[in-house]
């Protein structure tokens, strides 16, 4: 982004440099923006005129059927609900990987394209709120967090019973 701001990178003309999507929507109105201009109107849109997102991923939330109990988690709020679902959680060891989820669990409605959550994360207050939500989970005597960094670890943690729920990579 700095390289774009400093004129070191080439700026895209989205409609000239990229063809329309399979649905016929021109590039400047596409890029997962729901028809809003990705450079000016979309809150979670393109970070600069010199960059195009090329990776789309999701997080998997899993639980151990044998240790979770009769009630099963159904929402991201359940991941943080240690009264209803006591036990440790397995969370990826990255300071930013869990912030969106924490805000959703704390009551911020995602909005179209996650707009409300990303608006909150653009503020110091929103980031602090997300971090506090994760810290509360990790320090909860009914809960706690086990941080992982290798993709095979979440299933291992679940199978061993060390955690009752875990996040995992989608691939």
Predicted regions and their residues:
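A ligand-binding cleft/hinge motif common to bilobed small-molecule-binding domains
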Residues: 2, 167-171
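Extracytoplasmic ligand-binding site segments that recognize negatively charged/polar headgroups
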Residues: 1-157
């Amino acid at each position: 982004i700095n390289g774009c701001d400093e004129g070191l990178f080439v700026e895209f003309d989205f409609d000239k440099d990229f063809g329309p999507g399979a649905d016929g929507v021109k590039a400047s109105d596409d890029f997962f923006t729901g028809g809003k201009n990705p450079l000016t109107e979309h809150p979670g849109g393109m970070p600069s005129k010199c960059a195009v997102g090329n990776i789309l991923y999701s997080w998997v939330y899993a639980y151990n059927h044998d240790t979770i109990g009769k009630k099963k988690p159904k929402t991201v709020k359940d991941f943080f609900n240690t009264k209803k679902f006591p036990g440790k959680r397995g969370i990826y060891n990255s300071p930013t990987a869990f912030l969106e989820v924490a805000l959703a669990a704390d009551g911020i409605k995602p909005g179209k394209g996650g707009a409300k959550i990303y608006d909150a994360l653009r503020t110091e207050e929103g980031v602090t709120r997300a971090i506090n939500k994760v810290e509360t989970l990790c320090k909860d005597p009914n809960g706690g967090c086990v941080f992982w960094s290798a993709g095979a670890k979440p299933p291992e943690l679940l199978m061993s019973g060390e955690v009752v729920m875990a996040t995992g990579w989608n691939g």
